[in-house]
Amino acid sequence: MPVLSEDSGLHETLALLTSQLRPDSNHREEMGFLRDVFSEKSLGYLMKIHEKLRYYERQSPTPVLHSAMALAEDVMEELQAASVHSDERELLQLLSTPHLRAVLMVHDTVAQKNFDPVLPPLPDNIDEDFEEESVKIVRLVKNKEPLGATIRRDEHSGAVVVARIMRGGAADRSGLVHVGDELREVNGITVLHKRPDEISQILAQSQGSITLKIIPATQEEDRFKESKVFMRALFHYDPREDRAIPCQEAGLPFQQRQVLEVVSQDDPTWWQAKRVGDTNLRAGLIPSKQFQERRLSYRRTTGTIPSPQNLRKPLYDQPCDKETCDCDGYFKGHYVAGLRRSFRLGCRERLTGSQEVKVPVGAESQVLLTYEEVARYQHQPGERSRLVVLIGSLGAHLHELKQRVVAEDPQHFGVAVPHTTRPRKSHEREGVEYHFVSKQAFEADIQHNKFLEHGEHKENLYGTSLEAIQTVMAKNKVCLVDVEPEALRHLRTPEFKPYVIFVKPAIQEKRKTPPVSPDSEDPATPLDEQQQEMAASAAFIDQHYGHLIDTVLVRQDLQSVCSQLRAVIESLSKDTYWVPISWVR
């Protein structure tokens, strides 16, 4: 092994160490990391600078004099008085050049050590308590970005203190400003008797560098306690409309279903978070889960927002109600098991017209929609496919859509065979068209919560059981099920991992007459009654169940929406998705 000489520097030591690294089966990654680090050119340059500085410290050079500039001026004055020889004129010209004068000025500055900052003298009338406090001068360099800190007035001492540090902001990156620090001056302006909003305005107007005079907090907060919690927002939020937020400029707006990375939960009222996928590295303020729940509970109590039990529900997507039609499971001459008319045939008769409908009371109806903790999930080979749940507004024709997709690939897709109490017809087979059971057995299953949905049509009971869905999934098929939105809460379990797709019809305003020219204005006619019902149905689902929806498909025609649906289902086995954290634990 080569031996280093006593005069070898750190740079040569690192070079030799890099050449001596050998891969080890147990520490291959660590060895690779060290080799990459030691081979970096930037590290080599730093080592050379380090050696130069160490050499300088060992030599300890001292200046011959501390006023070279003054000496040069004296020499120039003598030469100007008697400038005869050419050498004297050349020396005078050389000493007069700006570059040499600048070098001499730098020499004097270094020799006199005038490069250290000089603090202003303390005022004569300063109190004794202030003299005992350690004052810290902090200079931050920032662009047009905010400082990344909020301030408040301490109720007991009246001092202006730092209330919070925004993760990723200028103050956080500096590591010099902490929660609890007392702010005394901003760019030489005292802030002892100014309001927090006046101080914020001074900070906002400061561009480039900003100098703060602060008194450090007695107990420094733990700045690096990252929570690394991912939350899906179940509501829309705009800090400009929130009067409770301590600083609107520090707020983080987000949309429903957007995933947020919560980086700090130190404040029980206001969390700090970032939008996942956002290029902005600075965190913003969002209401905490507890605070948002209290606000929603208060608004619900006072009637500001309606209670779920009192919602007026419009019609959802309805199946065909004819006894003989292509909805009976036949598609292009082939029969597909389970593709029968939905049990909601009876619901169509009962819900015709506008009437007050109570949303089923359950755990979901009492939940205050704030945040849902999520984690990344990717389907693994050999794992059961996720349940694909279709919900549709009026006019979506889900049964037709489901029928087309399953019939085109029955080996890959399947549907749950429903239960019924009606008598079996001569051409029907048990477990193919329906599971035929007695009314007593059907009602017993209802009592044991075995049905996802159930209803009555012409004095016969129809229903889709959870067991029927499990049977399809056990065959390694993608199970398609269409339900009313209220039933989604029964399916949101780790077993099913449902992917919810909302299908709504395309609604376009009709023109009275074709326009004469492209520039002519021809107002569209209002939506007819049927289109208004479709629009109201879609708006209701989006407003009250949008937090449960993963994808929205707009049905222009059957072929296009089928292609979109198949593409979405295909991506479920390839892409990574955010799901409730309870589904992956």
UniProtKB/Swiss-Prot annotation:
User: Which residue intervals define the domain Guanylate kinase-like in the entry?
Assistant: 385-570
What is the role of the protein in this entry?
Answer: Participates in cell spreading through the phosphoinositide-3-kinase (PI3K) pathway by connecting CADM1 to DLG1 and the regulatory subunit of phosphoinositide-3-kinase (PI3K). Stabilizes HTR2C at the plasma membrane and prevents its desensitization. May participates in the maintenance of adherens junctions.
Entry's family note = Belongs to the MAGUK family.
Assigned keywords, A-Z: Cell junction, Cell membrane, Membrane, Phosphoprotein, Repeat, SH3 domain
Q: Taking every annotated instance into account, which residue ranges of this chain make up the domain L27?
A: 6-60, 61-118
InterPro entries, A to Z: GK/Ca_channel_bsu, Guanylate_kin-like_dom, Guanylate_kinase_CS, L27_C, L27_dom, L27_dom_sf, MAGUK, MPP3_SH3
For molecular function, the Gene Ontology terms on record are: PDZ domain binding
Name of the protein this chain belongs to? MAGUK p55 subfamily member 3
Q: Which domain of life is it from?
A: Eukaryota
Describe its assembly.
Interacts with HTR2C; this interaction stabilizes the receptor at the plasma membrane and prevents the desensitization of the HTR2C receptor-mediated calcium response. Interacts with HTR2A. Interacts with HTR4. Interacts (via PDZ domain) with CADM1 (via C-terminus)Interacts (via PDZ domain) with CADM1; this interaction connects CADM1 with DLG1. Interacts (via Guanylate kinase-like domain) with PALS1.
Q: Which PROSITE patterns match?
A: GUANYLATE_KINASE_1 (PS00856), GUANYLATE_KINASE_2 (PS50052), L27 (PS51022), PDZ (PS50106), SH3 (PS50002)
Q: Where are the transmembrane segments?
A: none
Tell me which residues make up the PDZ domain.
137-218
The SH3 domain extends over 226-296
Q: Where in the cell is it found?
A: Apical cell membrane; Cell membrane; Cell junction, Adherens junction
Could you tell me which residues carry Phosphoserine?
A: 307
Instruction: List the GO terms this entry assigns under cellular component, sorted alphabetically.
Output: adherens junction; apical plasma membrane; cell-cell junction; plasma membrane
Which segments carry the region annotation Disordered? Answer: 510-530
CDD domains tied to this protein:
GMPK, PDZ_MPP3-MPP4-MPP7-like, SH3_MPP3
